[in-house]
């Protein structure tokens, strides 16, 4: 079922990161889809950018069309909190909260889940641990945690590259999306009902309020469709498509 809404979002024009394309400006329009997926907690685009890939707390990975239809890809029972794709080979990476691990689903069949590395700094966080994984570049991923709003960079072989906290402006990291065009990170904070835009080294650029989204735990910037996809982990899982303008 598709519901269409118009809302007034207070969107400010914000400058781009580094010397890349500017950060998009959010518009008034959004749509919401009810999705057949329990506890949606991670989103990214597939390799061809023809659909979304999604993961859920119950350990499922699905392909979701841009109109909300879901198709099963993989299930393991692990507490999946974040999903991202390596664009060079199509491998899927998953953030597993209970064990604080990053797992891999090798392309193209996605029928085997293997351990990549442990996030040792989050080993004591339990159910307040890692919530997001996001491919950056040169075989480096970002990993974000709920507790402490920690942001780590890891090589995919498990080597820690850097560690910072976004706690100056965020109460948690519920989801991450790296926008290559602007060289910026988008960060969802479900507790504050906000989405932040910051540089890759954690300098805040701006923020957007999303009071109409109950529990934003998944986030994907889609420049081809000029929108932001936001997954909300509610009683009935919802996928929001929020329009933006490329500046």
Predicted regions and their residues:
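Sequence/structural signature of beta-propeller domains
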Residues: 17-247
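Sec-dependent N-terminal signal peptides
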Residues: 5-14
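N-terminal secretory signal peptides that target proteins for export/translocation
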Residues: 1-2
């Amino acid at each position: 079922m598709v519901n269409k809404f118009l809302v007034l979002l207070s969107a400010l024009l914000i400058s781009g990161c580094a010397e890349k394309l500017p950060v998009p400006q959010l518009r008034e329009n959004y749509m919401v889809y009810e999705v057949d997926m329990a506890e949606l907690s991670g989103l990214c685009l597939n390799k061809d950018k023809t659909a979304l890939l999604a993961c859920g707390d119950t350990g499922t990975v699905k392909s979701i069309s841009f109109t909300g239809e879901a198709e099963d890809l993989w299930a393991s029972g692990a507490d999946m909190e974040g999903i991202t794709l390596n664009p060079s080979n199509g491998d899927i990476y998953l953030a597993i909260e209970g064990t604080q691990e990053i797992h891999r689903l090798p392309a193209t069949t996605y029928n085997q889940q293997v351990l990549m590395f442990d996030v040792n700094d989050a080993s004591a966080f339990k159910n307040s641990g890692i919530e997001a994984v996001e491919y950056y570049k040169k075989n480096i991923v970002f990993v974000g945690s709920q507790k402490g709003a920690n942001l780590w960079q890891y090589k995919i072989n498990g080597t820690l590259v850097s560690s910072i906290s976004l706690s100056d402006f965020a109460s948690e990291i519920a989801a991450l999306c790296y926008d290559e065009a602007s060289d910026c990170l988008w960060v969802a904070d479900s507790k504050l009902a906000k989405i932040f835009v910051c540089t890759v080294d954690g300098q805040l650029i701006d923020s957007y309020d999303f009071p109409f989204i109950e529990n934003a735990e998944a986030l994907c910037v889609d420049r081809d469709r000029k929108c932001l996809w936001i997954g909300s982990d509610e009683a009935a899982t919802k996928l929001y498509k929020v329009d933006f303008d490329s500046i």
